[in-house]
From Swiss-Prot:
This is Fatty acid-binding protein, intestinal. FABPs are thought to play a role in the intracellular transport of long-chain fatty acids and their acyl-CoA esters. FABP2 is probably involved in triglyceride-rich lipoprotein synthesis. Binds saturated long-chain fatty acids with a high affinity, but binds with a lower affinity to unsaturated long-chain fatty acids. FABP2 may also help maintain energy homeostasis by functioning as a lipid sensor. It comes from Mus musculus (Mouse). InterPro entries: Calycin, FABP2, Fatty_acid-bd, ILBP, Lipocln_cytosolic_FA-bd_dom. Belongs to the calycin superfamily. Fatty-acid binding protein (FABP) family. The modification N-acetylalanine is found at A2. Tetradecanoate binds at W83, R107. The lineage of its organism: Eukaryota, Metazoa, Chordata, Craniata, Vertebrata. The gene is Fabp2. Hexadecanoate binds at W83, R107.
Amino acid sequence: MAFDGTWKVDRNENYEKFMEKMGINVMKRKLGAHDNLKLTITQDGNKFTVKESSNFRNIDVVFELGVNFPYSLADGTELTGAWTIEGNKLIGKFTRVDNGKELIAVREVSGNELIQTYTYEGVEAKRFFKKE
């Protein structure tokens, strides 16, 4: 699948505004914008493993398409939701445990770039990753 590989964050678009809308404090927003996030994605049928490595944490996230699972953001925000594939996009629909509001994440590959788009409460942000 096109998502397989190791992806290193290259740049962000509107990411601090997104984090602000999520309620993340200013210090964590500044640090989060420079987290050096690296994603290593492997797919086996409907099962994905995403190794997240950053300045803040190293975790393995394992999920199956269409199956709800719990997930914590780097700042500790708890979510529950599922990923699905629509065309060439991996779409995550998550609900915050603390307030019930929806967070959408979309991953798509364009050339040697993985573009991850987040939408929360009308604020959209993008993170661009280069394939290593």
